[in-house]
Amino acid sequence: MKIAGIDEAGRGPVIGPMVIAAVVVDENSLPKLEELKVRDSKKLTPKRREKLFNEILGVLDDYVILELPPDVIGSREGTLNEFEVENFAKALNSLKVKPDVIYADAADVDEERFARELGERLNFEAEVVAKHKADDIFPVVSAASILAKVTRDRAVEKLKEEYGEIGSGYPSDPRTRAFLENYYREHGEFPPIVRKGWKTLKKIAEKVESEKKAEERQATLDRYFRKV
């Protein structure tokens, strides 16, 4: 029997791609994944994730990594959950080795609904099990999580080569916010690596525009008093 796991990395960032990884392994090879001690990618160091990446590939029967650029995410129709279900299905439908059972990390608060909606979009028959924190429960989902996270990390590193320090890309990262504020202040717009429509961008733009107006008012006052 063939078992699949699927997970994403980069759902919440304002910068960079979302990456979805779907993996397939024979049930007889599951102990090999367990021997690698795969687990939720967020609980592993970048160095450990990189090492596991190639080791995981050696155990798999098949895998697909889908990289969704920020412009596609920002211009999507529907909710982020719907977008994720559609692209989970796209990744799974692209597998050459079709699984009999799929374990997925549920993006929906309703696990059964997520499993049902994912199953309805598949072009093959398979049992779908969706759980919250599936990457902590099922090694096959942990493996998918690691492939997705490493791929996103590599993409972010490439962006840093072009744009400098952008942080992790998450709105809560002060480095990311500083980069976006400075870029908007200098260019009057955000770089093409952001996800348009994110509330963070609106807040930053409003903050910078407010600061510019305050600076202009102060400059006007300074000129007036110099004349006086």
Curated annotation (Swiss-Prot):
The residue ranges of the RNase H type-2 domain are 1-210
Entry-linked CDD domains = RNase_HII_archaea_like
| UniProt-reported outcome of changing residue 8 to A | Reduces activity by 99%
Q: Where in the cell is it found?
A: Cytoplasm
Which controlled-vocabulary keywords does the entry list? Cobalt, Cytoplasm, Endonuclease, Hydrolase, Magnesium, Metal-binding, Nuclease
Coarse class of the primary localization is cytoplasm
Question: What InterPro entries has UniProt attached to this entry?
Answer: RNase_H2_suA (IPR004649), RNase_HII/HIII (IPR001352), RNase_HII/HIII_dom (IPR024567), RNase_HII_arc (IPR020787), RNase_HII_hlx-loop-hlx_cap_dom (IPR023160), RNaseH-like_sf (IPR012337), RNaseH_sf (IPR036397)
Q: What is its EC number?
A: 3.1.26.4
Binding-site positions, a divalent metal cation: 7-8, 105
The effect annotated for residue 135 to A is: Reduces activity by 98%
Q: What is an annotated GO biological process for this record, any one?
A: DNA replication, removal of RNA primer
Domain of life where this protein originates: Archaea
| GO MF entries | manganese ion binding; RNA binding; RNA-DNA hybrid ribonuclease activity
What reaction does this enzyme carry out catalytically?
Answer: Endonucleolytic cleavage to 5'-phosphomonoester
The cofactor(s) it depends on are: Mn(2+); Mg(2+)
CC per GO annotation:
cytoplasm; ribonuclease H2 complex
Cofactor: binding comment: Manganese or magnesium. Binds 1 divalent metal ion per monomer in the absence of substrate. May bind a second metal ion after substrate binding.
Pfam families assigned to the protein according to its UniProt record, in alphabetical order = RNase_HII (PF01351)
Protein function: Endonuclease that specifically degrades the RNA of RNA-DNA hybrids.
PANTHER family associated with the record:
RIBONUCLEASE, RIBONUCLEASE H2 SUBUNIT A
NCBIfam families, alphabetized:
ribonuclease HII (TIGR00729)
Assembly: Monomer.
Question: Which HAMAP family does the entry mention?
Answer: RNase_HII_A
What family does the entry list?
A: Belongs to the RNase HII family.
Q: What is this protein called?
A: Ribonuclease HII
Provide the organism lineage as a comma list: Archaea, Methanobacteriati, Methanobacteriota, Thermococci, Thermococcales
Identify the coding gene. rnhB
